[in-house]
Amino acid sequence: MTTPQQPHGPLRSFGRLKSRPVKPRQQALLDTLLPEIAVPTGPFQPLDLMPEAKAVWLEIGFGGGEHMASQAGRNPETLVIGAEPFVNGVASAVRHVEEQALKNVRIHEGDARDVVDWLPDACLDRVFIMFPDPWHKARHNKRRLIQPEFVAKLARVMKPGAALRFATDWADYAEWTTERVLADPSFRFADEAADRNAIPADHVTTRYEEKKLGDCAPVFLDFTRG
């Protein structure tokens, strides 16, 4: 099993790395399948992982992997890279990959910010950040993933015209993200008039979303890299 990397920088944007023992079948997949589909540790070219890919997508913090696996299944010609530090989530995702026989998924067990640092300029066609840890207490806001420095890093690795989707069920995190993403001149709303509470046609509901742990209905923010 791949050992989770040390937190990126002085503050990490995620909580516990493990909540419960991994089931034997999932552990077997972590030991055998995960090494085969893991992204390299260090700078890499995405198309080296799947030369025939017509697009490259990144999901940051894929949770249990339901959304990532469904998107990959619907888009078999797209390379879908996912990053997740939570070992139980990675175990679940690897099971989805095996059960659905997905050939276009690559996984990093660790901090997604490392993957963003390793990627070359202008290589991503789409980025998903679905229901990240809200760190909703004011004293913890500095731990939120969406910070100006990270938005700038996303701008570097996304192609002109690439799409960024951020979803949350915490109202203040939606406002926080809107302010910080639009403050970067590289980004704009994909549709200024869009209903942010409308569920996108290509959205895949996850178990986390169904728990309704936030303080508002899900908000979907779709941005375009200029």
Curated annotation (Swiss-Prot):
Gene Ontology CC annotation, any one: tRNA methyltransferase complex
Pathway(s) where this gene product acts: tRNA modification; N(7)-methylguanine-tRNA biosynthesis
UniProt binding sites for substrate: K137, D169, T206, R207, Y208, E209
Active site: D133
Catalyzed reaction equations: guanosine(46) in tRNA + S-adenosyl-L-methionine = N(7)-methylguanosine(46) in tRNA + S-adenosyl-L-homocysteine
Reported function: Catalyzes the formation of N(7)-methylguanine at position 46 (m7G46) in tRNA.
Name used for this protein in its record: tRNA (guanine-N(7)-)-methyltransferase
The species this protein was found in: Caulobacter vibrioides (strain NA1000 / CB15N) (Caulobacter crescentus)
